[in-house]
Amino acid sequence: MLNYMNEYEKWLHSGALTADEVKELQSIAGDEKEIESRFYGPLEFGTAGLRGTMKVGLHQMNVHVIRWATQGFADVIAAEGDEAKQKGVAICMDCRVNSMAFARAAAEVCAANGIRVRIFESLRPTPELSFAVRYYGCQAGINVTASHNPKEYNGYKVYWADGAQLPPQHAAAIAARLEQIDIFTGVKRMAFDDAVKAGLITLLGEETDKMFMSNVMAMINDRASVAQVADSFKVVYTPFHGCGWKLVPEALRGLGVKNLYCVEQQMVLDGTFPTVASPNPENPEGFYLAIELADKVGADFILGTDPDSDRVGIMVRGADGKFIAVTGNQTGVLLLDYLIGAMRRAGKMPEHPYFLKTIVTTEMARKVAESNGVTCCDTFTGFKFMAEKKNALEAAGEGHVIMSYEESYGYMLGDYVRDKDAVTASLLITEMAAWYAAKGMTLYDALQALYKKYGWYGEKTHNLIMPGLDGLEKMAALMKRLRTAPPANIAGVDVVVRKDYQDGSTVDCATGNVGKMELSGSNVLRFELADGTTILVRPSGTEPKIKVYILTKGADAAERDANIEKYSAWVKTLTE
């Protein structure tokens, strides 16, 4: 661990800070706890890049940390050779405070290192950055975004040539490189306007939007059903003050939606997210304005995309006519079942279709896929792993991936992006809602029909928050305890199989026989129980919390709900 007081003094007297930044550091002079939290070490550079609160300090998101991270990334790109520098990087940003300044700072560092830059003139959805990397044949990509985190946060996501987030070996190479670079004296910079004049920086805009949207619109399977209900079918949409504001409505109107109502207060681009406590479509509370509008106009379907427009959440009217949130697990199952049928009806289904999900995503999705002749593969959490699996399957000629999704509201569709994509997902979820509307069904009705057909599956995710400097220690201690003294039963139900994705081992609890899984190298534990329930435990990659996933099934809705309650009570004992 760094000597945080020395690091604090180094920053204070570096001569690299603005007067405001110096003033901010002087204001915490007597607060050792605050100094420690800002300077005890650098933000960890992982496969998702960097994420943190926006303050002055080494363990924070600010222009100095952005430049430093970019210098490390630039060195890794340059190590690939001159051709890689020529292919260059695509850079994008979201609506957050400082996102544009951070993106331009990253562009200046790349240009100073002789790396060609294509930077969006203004904020864009994350999937469009993935698309731009692939479309322009770039070596890499940088996206300044903290996705759905609270307004105090920003982040720095890095992509490689396939348009997916960095694989672990490249992330490790950058992290190693950063240890060699001084944050102030080790960074090259070239003024933005000078780099534009020198031809090292090019601005991207409408032309890239058009190419991206032509790919999105080619994903439509069934315009006829949309046209059939167009006069009565009403959609309410909110971008939560973020990047979906332009392209999602464009996609829905292009699909043939005549009655699209956007939540005006949340169509305002604003990185302080003034109308919501959290701009996360996983939180139903954020949809209160959308529900008001839907009730006013008589809509029964609501879509919301997060600030960088890579994740989408939906709300539909339940049996009593009131709006209920449809979870990411449920939305994915609905969309998968719909797409399999729609692609077959449209003659678009590949010969050997594959479907990808993460290990913590509902097993109902596997049932839907396999019942319909689609092969299901599991990956670790994160779209870089799904992108990697898609690339591998398709390169080997084994089949073609029609959809990939994870329970946290992310869907990857089509072949033109390698990250979660709320623009395309919003389009296809809306097409699906219209198709069911043409049959006189809401998406709530459709979901109940799927439960009757495939089984009463249920899921719940618990977040065990462990804040503070000792949070990481508490997280590690809990994982260690579950490894070294695993439970023989959970809530009175026997554990039948234990799986540890760290080393890829499986243990048959009855015989003690040890086996090997295909997947390994991730800090996740899995307990498979005698009643068919699965419980997974893993530390979050971006926040100080342990995530516990309950994946269960009942003979009917009542038994499913009782199972969720029973296992949720056990989860609460983990922190006692």
Where would I find each of the regions flagged by the language model?
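Glycine-rich phosphate-binding loop plus the immediately following alpha-helix
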Residues: 159-189, 329-352, 357-366, 422
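Phosphate-binding and adjacent anionic-ligand microenvironments
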Residues: 295, 299-301, 322-324, 342-538, ...
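Short Gly/Thr/Asp-enriched flexible loops that form oxyanion-binding sites at enzyme active sites
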Residues: 102-110, 153-160, 310-329, 365
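N-terminal small/polar loop signature for handling phosphorylated ligands or for N-terminal nucleophile
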Residues: 90-153, 256-313
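An N-terminal, well-structured beta->alpha segment
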Residues: 2-3, 8-106, 195-235, 243
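Conserved phosphate/anionic-ligand binding catalytic regions in large, soluble enzymes, centered on
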Residues: 39-59, 146-149, 239-251, 307, ...
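Gly/Ser/Thr-enriched, mixed-charge loops and adjacent short helices
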Residues: 34-43, 154-286, 292-294
